[in-house]
């Protein structure tokens, strides 16, 4: 009788991955323009239960601070359609917001929070994933109860 195999505990690969090696990053700003391709947008649409994701892009600036924390700033935008919670019709939306995230290595994991920003996100193997960070920001910005324009409020 074969032994049951242990579950693979690795994280699934993100649908939209844009890795940035911050371990070799100096103090100079690193500018990054990222845009999801059609395959990535389709996978993200499935993940976030969207009818469609026509565009997801970001213009980012990464800078390592004196304390070793990497600050990511910029702006993201998306063109998408969610399903109306009443009629199930597509509800188009354009979303976007400023980005201000902080990433710190294992040495910073037990550090105090960064003023008003909270704790920095972890850096794994000296790399951060700018695409996944922006995808998560979009996910948080989605309307939890989208309604078609002609549907009255409850």
Locations of the language-model features?
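Acidic and generally charged, gly/proline-rich low-complexity regions
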Residues: 2-154
């Amino acid at each position: 009788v074969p032994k049951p195999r242990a579950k693979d505990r690795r994280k699934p690969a993100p649908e939209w991955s844009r890795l940035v090696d911050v371990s070799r990053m100096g103090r100079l700003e690193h500018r990054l323009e990222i845009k999801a391709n059609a395959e990535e947008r389709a996978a993200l649409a499935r993940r976030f239960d969207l009818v469609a994701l026509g565009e997801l892009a970001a213009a980012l600036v990464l800078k390592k601070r004196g304390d070793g924390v990497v600050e990511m700033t910029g702006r993201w935008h998306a063109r998408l359609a969610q399903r109306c919670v009443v009629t199930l019709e597509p509800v188009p939306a354009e979303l976007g917001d400023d980005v201000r995230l902080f990433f710190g290595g294992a040495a910073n994991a037990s550090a105090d929070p960064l003023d008003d920003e909270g704790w920095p996100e972890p850096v794994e193997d000296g790399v951060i994933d700018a695409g996944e960070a922006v995808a998560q920001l979009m996910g948080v910005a989605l309307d939890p109860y989208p309604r078609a324009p002609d549907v009255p409020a409850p």
